[in-house]
Amino acid sequence: MSWLAPFAQVECCDIVTIGRVSGKPRSTELWFGVSSDTLILISGTSHSDWRENALANSRVEVRINNVVKTGTARLVTDANERRAYGDVMAAKYDWDGDPSSGLTRQMWCYEAPVIAVSNWN
């Protein structure tokens, strides 16, 4: 069983990235999904510092409750994998979107960039 399994229904995690400009640790609270041993993170906007930081330095720290692990982040580019991860997030979060930014639930679940974190230490 993956270390993530007991946390699959926890609402949020903290992801700590290294600032691509500052070089300093940056912590961001995010919704997340779990698929086997992979943590799923969706960036709802076209610009997201945590996402850009994770892409610049793929070693990220994830904190869920009192458990801290380090993993490798990657941008999900495979369409089938992206759809499967969107399904995980759609099942977990009953959210209608953000009208102020024009982000719909459909866009967030199935079109926004996804970061997958795995290869845990």
Protein language model regions, located:
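Short, basic/aromatic recognition patches
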Residues: 1-12
